[in-house]
Amino acid sequence: GYFLFRPRN
């Protein structure tokens, strides 16, 4: 979802 905060999401 939020690659800015969660690289795997």
From Swiss-Prot:
It holds the Pfam family NMU. This is Neuromedin-U-9. The modification Asparagine amide is found at residue 9. Stimulates uterine smooth muscle contraction and causes selective vasoconstriction. Its main location: secreted. It comes from the Eukaryota. Keywords: Amidation, Hormone, Secreted.
